[in-house]
Structures are given as structure tokens and as C-alpha cells.
């Protein structure tokens, strides 16, 4: 639904929820930004990613050198960019005080990077509950998710925004 309204999916390209969200967006011709845990040349060696780039269906962004390989540290750093590029995020399952999902959500809350919503319905993890205690918004059901305004309303300007100068 969010993609059909024009929202862009920002994906860490990880297996699991990241790939499912990315695939669902692509199935309905949505836009996807991929933030890999390795250099762009490395991730582009994967046939599926390379084909999506060539078709103009995904934009890859990375703060890392093009040929850099995977490391846990880079994966943790990548999460910052996923949150920073997002207006809002949904944490489906987080470990308690460990792992990339926890670190990214915790940092996003501390830095006020993006709205952080956390699944608190059936099957919610202890990490999810703890993130709500730190300020994330609880989402106890699918209906609540859609009704909560997770999908931000488009910005409306009375006038055109001012173009800032770089130099």
C-alpha cells in the first residue's frame, strides 16, 4: 500500500524482511533504494541486483569503497544510512540490546533520524518491547499499523521550497 502511494522502500538488502520488502515493492513497480553492507561493485556481482540496476529498478547507495567486502562493522554502519534515508521505519523483530536491528533503531531514536515504529503484536520480541520503552511507537496490529500514520502524508508547500546553495 505504501509503495502504491509513491513511498520508496529503503532496504539494507539483507535476507529476510529487507529482501521481502524490496521484492514486494518491485512487484508493483515501486522504487527501491538499496544500501549494501559492502562496496557497490561487490554487491553488483549478484545477478539479481545487477539486473535490477541495469533495468533502473533499484538505486544503490554506499558510503564504502566500491570493492570493499562484507564485515560486521560495515553492516552496523550501513544501518545508519538506512534510517537516515527513511522518513519512517518499521522494526519487525529486534534482539534485546544486541544486533544490527537494535543498534540501528536505538541510534535512530537517539538521533531523531526517522520515526521508528515497532511491532508489538503477536510474536513481538523482548527487543521490540524495549525499543518502545526508549521512545519508538508501538504497533500492536496490522490495522493499527495502517491507521497510525506510518505512511507519512506528503508535504504540502504554500510556495516552492528555497533552493540552498552549496558554495
Language model feature labels by segment:
Residues 1-167:
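Glycine-biased, small-residue-rich flexible motifs in mid-sequence functional cores and linkers
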